[in-house]
Amino acid sequence: MFDWLWSDPLIVGNEAPDFAARDDRGRFVSLREHRGKWSVVLIFYPKDETRLCTKQVCDFRDSWQSAEARETRVYGVNPDSAESHRKFSSKHDLPFPLLVDEGQRIAKLYNCNGPIVKRTVYLIGKDGRVKFARRGTPSPSVVLATAD
């Protein structure tokens, strides 16, 4: 019944699954477009405007310049609507896009799906491989230390 709680994140070193989704700004984003150019942080979080989710996303907001300096793009990911994401982003001055994960399609690819999205952070290298994968709320500095 609760097997979904115990699934592991993707294995570090493996190729990250490609995905495509719209962000809160209406732009179409895919992992493939970053390959060879940028590392990518994916912050999977359950819901906009909840206490822990807001703290986690704002921690990455506060480290955004460090991510940019490491040629790393940051994306929040959850199944909330584009409108919810726009309001959340505006309220908290988020400098990075939030992806609309309809039907938890991206979450399924990254073993984060379930009745609620499992809080997980990934860093995908410029080579398309998983460099960092951890459930919970790892510090942005720990995550970004693994960037190419």
Regions found by a protein language model. Name each.
Residues 1-148:
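Chalcogenol-based redox active-site neighborhoods
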